[in-house]
Amino acid sequence: MTQIRTMTEQDVPAVSLLLGQSWRYTYSPILGAETTARLSDEKHAPERLAAELRDDSKMSFVAKRADGSLAGYAMAAMDDKGEVMLERLHIDKGEYGTGLAADLLLAVLAAHAGIPSIALEVIEGNDRAIAFYRKHGFEVVERREAAHGVEGRASLIMRRLLPMA
């Protein structure tokens, strides 16, 4: 059984490790191993993750197993217009198919109750993620070139409209 809670500073090393593993597994076949490693090391450095925790516009969640190990992580950011972007949702490969990713997504949505929609960016070719988000009500609204600054790799912007309470 996993418990989802708000991320703390103590979670930073494990989250950094999980993100590195998840990125390498997911994106190496799409972006190449070298590019994936470079981007992941830049984006998921512990000091960067710790700084994000201090940013009031961002909310981060972790899913912890009963033994205390990290099973998943999600982070969403709200811009100055009140629009929310799901920046990250990653789970340990061993958790695929368990419903954990859906639970993390629900935690993010619950934390942002009352917003009209939530968006995300996914690299074209990440078919597993695209299928997951479609299953959970997201639709492609835009295609962008140079996903994550990588020329020749497009990304899809997906959005889910949310019921207003």
Model-derived segments and spans:
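Extreme N-terminal starter segment of soluble prokaryotic enzymes
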Residues: 2-3
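Acetyl-CoA-dependent GNAT
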Residues: 6-12, 16-96, 102-111, 144-146, ...
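A short, structure-level motif marking secondary-structure boundaries and short turns
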Residues: 34-35, 114-115, 121
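C-terminal "cap" of GNAT-fold acetyltransferases
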Residues: 61, 84, 117-130, 135-136, ...
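Helix N-cap/coil-helix junction residues
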Residues: 100-101, 138
